[in-house]
């Protein structure tokens, strides 16, 4: 299974995976509007991989088949205050 990966010019560390390069027909218009003009990053074969750096490969494959796309967003920022408070309680 091949997929094309695009980076968002509007949102840092946000990527859109689609089944076919430059075919955004299954991606909702609202998502594309908030994502910005997709910037091509790479073509990737998911069959030859067991994992991805920051996304669950099985979720990516499933979303591509069911929805035609997968949106990868960055993890939430760490709360340094919560970390500090947790350390002071211990």
From Swiss-Prot:
This is YcgL domain-containing protein YE2368. Coiled coil: none annotated. It comes from the Bacteria. Disulfide bonds: none annotated. The lineage of its organism: Bacteria, Pseudomonadati, Pseudomonadota, Gammaproteobacteria, Enterobacterales. HAMAP family: UPF0745. Residues 1-85 form the YcgL domain. SUPFAM superfamilies: YcgL-like.
């Amino acid at each position: 299974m091949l997929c094309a990966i695009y980076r968002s010019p509007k949102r840092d560390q946000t990527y859109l995976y689609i089944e076919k390069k430059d075919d955004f027909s299954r991606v909702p218009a609202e998502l594309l509007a908030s994502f910005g003009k997709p910037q091509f990053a790479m073509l990737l074969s998911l069959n030859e991989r067991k994992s991805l750096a920051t996304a669950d490969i099985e979720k990516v494959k499933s979303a591509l088949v069911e929805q035609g796309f997968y949106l990868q967003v960055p993890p939430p920022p760490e709360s340094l205050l919560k970390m500090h408070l947790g350390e002071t309680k211990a």
